[in-house]
UniProtKB/Swiss-Prot annotation:
Protein name as annotated: Large ribosomal subunit protein bL32
GO molecular function, one term: structural constituent of ribosome
Protein family: Belongs to the bacterial ribosomal protein bL32 family.
Keywords of this entry: Ribonucleoprotein, Ribosomal protein
Entry GO terms, CC: large ribosomal subunit
Domain of life: Bacteria
Organism: Mycolicibacterium gilvum (strain PYR-GCK) (Mycobacterium gilvum (strain PYR-GCK))
Cited HAMAP family: Ribosomal_bL32
Length: 57
């Protein structure tokens, strides 16, 4: 495991941490039972097979 050689300043630490941002999940269109829906790509196959309840909020 990497170990820092010197102490990192608070300003440098906070500016580095500020680069990490959450991203919205990319939605793709899928037609289920004749109705167009938008689901995350990782749930696309499950939505097509009917394993995911898309009517639930």
């Amino acid at each position: 495991m990497a170990v820092p050689k010197r102490r990192m300043s608070r300003a440098n630490t906070r500016s580095r941490r500020a680069q990490w941002k959450a991203e919205a999940t990319g939605l793709v269109s899928v037609t289920v039972a004749g109705q167009p829906r938008k689901v995350p790509r990782r749930l696309l196959k499950a939505a097509r097979l009917g394993l995911v309840d898309l009517d639930r909020r």
